[in-house]
């Protein structure tokens, strides 16, 4: 059989038309060492900092060290079966987590995968865990309050929307309790909450989730979990993942509150990763960039202006500002606030709530030390009534603490000093509050009004608690409209002052406690 040149060219054309080739450029490398969740890879020439590297078994690692002839990466997840010689690939993507309203009411891990047994998460898309914080021009000053429901905090150390307020103290001083109560108090405020648990026991987190559910706050909250048994990489990344979920609400003109519990454990996880990557250690064996670790996270908590929100949503949301308020928690050792990580975070944040173990052990809970606790920007966000009534409280407590120290050495005290000591003791007693019992602005205002106007003068110290409980029950029963008005407006004028005075006069005349 003889083919002529025309037939041959036709056959070749047909074969060329049928030929289908899909070329994929894979940047592939080989694992050369595996140690404690850190792998060293040879051959990834075009790898980026922070890039996800695909490992065998549908797992990923993140590239953190880019060296001349190798890449150091941390494995996200189990690593026991990884071995030298295994092939890995670059993905060309950085780590992203699911974001959106579908995450509210769910418990997820660092990567956004559900761990609460309630099925898949309904998300609105993905966001990169690392993001640049809004610039100065995109921000707006803090002038709206976040009510924690604690008299001691809302009166003396007020927190505003978009603020970063550090909660610092030794272990077992009520840091998590304060943060959880702040979340519970946002049930009806419209503020979405994110609770990031880093390096805690799974049983502790389970209790927190159960309490949030009991008090009707879980539906408004995303819980991000990296337990103590998980890899250091997941503990290090958990706060950034939670922050990305919070930014979803901030950038769409809504308000969000995020709790990092706690950043001390994140710093320890990062130290572990850095030492395994053979980065040079510095003070307390932390790497040189441990300040940047926290500053780039906490700077993302901000109040953004309406122009930023409008530009981000492409005009869908107009005239609304957004905010992400951060309450990072730091655990100190024996009250040492001058250690490396505590001083770093104190310098980054807009104030701190210092909880003292000796106050906690003395039964003063929340164990807030008003002397060294401060809110640098929250004063502008305080409601008018709280600002008016709380000024005298801080002064009374400061004078009381000074006189209490002095009175230990003086046997005979004049009447004025005795009155100040008595008033200070009663204010201290009044600021005590049970856990899971946050108070509204109106309730706090009434109690502070009673303290400031001398209505506690003839009340025995032991009966302050029952006096407060009876007073709140009385106003809820007989003066609910006024309480509602104060909660809605937060205003203070002669009329409201007169009504509060009338309530306290009639209560003391007709009620018992």
UniProtKB/Swiss-Prot annotation:
It catalyses: ATP + H2O + 4 H(+)(in) = ADP + phosphate + 5 H(+)(out). Keywords: ATP synthesis, ATP-binding, Cell inner membrane, Cell membrane, CF(1), Hydrogen ion transport, Ion transport, Membrane, Nucleotide-binding, Translocase, Transport. Produces ATP from ADP in the presence of a proton gradient across the membrane. The alpha chain is a regulatory subunit. ATP binds at residues 169-176. The lineage of its organism: Bacteria, Pseudomonadati, Pseudomonadota, Gammaproteobacteria, Enterobacterales. GO terms for molecular function: ADP binding; ATP binding; proton-transporting ATP synthase activity, rotational mechanism. Its EC number is 7.1.2.2. It comes from the Bacteria. InterPro entries: ATP_synth_asu-like_sf (IPR023366), ATP_synth_asu_C (IPR000793), ATP_synth_asu_C_sf (IPR038376), ATP_synth_F1_a_nt-bd_dom (IPR033732), ATP_synth_F1_asu (IPR005294), ATPase_a/bsu_AS (IPR020003), ATPase_F1/V1/A1_a/bsu_N (IPR004100), ATPase_F1/V1/A1_a/bsu_N_sf (IPR036121). Its main location: membrane. The keyword Protein biosynthesis does not apply. Belongs to the ATPase alpha/beta chains family. F-type ATPases have 2 components, CF(1) - the catalytic core - and CF(0) - the membrane proton channel. CF(1) has five subunits: alpha(3), beta(3), gamma(1), delta(1), epsilon(1). CF(0) has three main subunits: a(1), b(2) and c(9-12). The alpha and beta chains form an alternating ring which encloses part of the gamma chain. CF(1) is attached to CF(0) by a central stalk formed by the gamma and epsilon chains, while a peripheral stalk is formed by the delta and b chains. The keyword Thylakoid does not apply. It is found in: Cell inner membrane. It is a peripheral membrane protein. The record marks 373 as: Required for activity. This is ATP synthase subunit alpha. GO terms for cellular component: plasma membrane; proton-transporting ATP synthase complex.
